[in-house]
Swiss-Prot record:
Binding site for Mn(2+) 1: D268, D345, E347
Protein name from the UniProt record: Probable cytosol aminopeptidase
Gene3D superfamilies per record: Leucine Aminopeptidase, subunit E, domain 1, Zn peptidases
Name of the encoding gene: pepA
Cofactor note: Binds 2 manganese ions per subunit.
Species assigned in the record: Bradyrhizobium sp. (strain BTAi1 / ATCC BAA-1182)
GO CC terms: cytoplasm
Stated family: Belongs to the peptidase M17 family.
Binding site for Mn(2+) 2: K263, D268, D286, E347
Sample GO molecular function, one term: metalloaminopeptidase activity
Role description: Presumably involved in the processing and regular turnover of intracellular proteins. Catalyzes the removal of unsubstituted N-terminal amino acids from various peptides.
Disulfide-bonded cysteines: none
GO biological process, any: proteolysis
Amino acid sequence: MSDTVKVGFVPLSTAPRGILVAFCDESLRLGAATDKALGGAAELIQRAAAAARFKGKDGAVLDLLAPQGIKIQRLLVIGTGKSGDHKEKDFLKYGGTLAGKLNAGTEPVMVMAELPSGPMTPDQASSLAAGIRLRAYRFDRYKTKKKDEEAAVSAAISLAVADVAAAKKAFAPRSHVTDGVILARDLVNEPPNVLYPEEFAKRASALRKLGVTVEILDVPAMKKLGMGALLGVGQGSARPSRTVVMRYNGGKKGDQPVAFIGKGVCFDTGGISIKPAGSMEDMKGDMGGAACVVGLMHALAARKAKANVIGAIGLVENMPDGNAQRPGDIVTSMSGQTIEIINTDAEGRLVLADVLWYVATKFKPKFMIDLATLTGAIMVALGTEHAGLFANNDDLAEKLLKAGQETGEKVWRMPLGPEYDKLIDSQFADMKNTGGRHGGSITAAQFLQRFVSDTPWAHLDIAGTAMGAPKSEVNQSWGSGYGVRLLDRLVWDCYEARS
């Protein structure tokens, strides 16, 4: 897992050194402990703010050389906007903002976890710390020469808090979730010659150290199960396909598990229906759903979530070859349903079809959610701000929408219905793997729905959010790790919020 900045907690009364980070609202007021740490220099700071036209707007930053006579070299003041009720995602953002202003160096950094109204709560301070870690992430392990501006923050960062023990306790689970996001980012960012199905499965097996049971299904095992849809996708690759099933039991013995399923196309050329050359290199990220599931399982197991959870990922390469799947082929899925292949570049749904059926029938989960960089059509519809949400269960959909609002990993519900489902009927088989030009993300979801039986189910099309999305306060990486925080919050809301 990629290294990121080290964050710790110290008492609010600690004397600052090096770089000091403070917070103010639109009145430009500082907290009492911050003002004391600055030796009563608030008036001087207000004059500097006026000269810089800094008004304390939410996320704005005032960057100053420290006033003379104070034992710090630099002062960063971050605006929090109007005083009022700030959400967890706001403090995550503030942490990312301040980390973005810190250069690589050895100067100690102290962050005054204090608002003008008083000290931040342990939850607020821990969200701030998580935001710092997420923003500081870099994936540069293959660079032999690094520019100064590309270097990660190297100094340790101390958050000055009112209650150190409470802040550490609140941060522990958030730190594990952050580790899960970082793991997911690492997997998405890896080059495809390094991260192929067998290697991906090997990395997922490292979760055993956290008490996760990991089972790896090889090609003979999948053939025995009848996973013809998944195996058809990978038959043109020299790299054999894999399905990885991860089980974490943190809930009550005998309770139904919940399940998360990820599309893991480690590289997608499109197969015989080959993609254009432009930006094909981005298809190393077509396993963003599987990366999220592995990162999520890490987060849940490490923080000891109180739920029984299944994570399952189908891992393939979609390559053109003399043995590759052809348009016109008909394959038989594990469910027994037959599928006519119209376009070999609509492969992710074939992978998911068998894994969804396997999980639904073997584990009978309370609900299951799949994640996939499934369609370009969802990016046409929603851009890169929201993942597409499709569901056969309104309660599950509402819980996902709520978790998205709380974490900032937003989803937008899209329609399903028989009018769309009939578009994937085939003349020669039970169904075909594409439904035509229009409503492409919807017909892809309708295809998946045919493999979930009566299980409450949601599908997240993360093609616009998992990779190459616009950079944000908490993510400067090509691979975003989208979905780990969203689904961790869902598990928390469903199983732990009242415990």
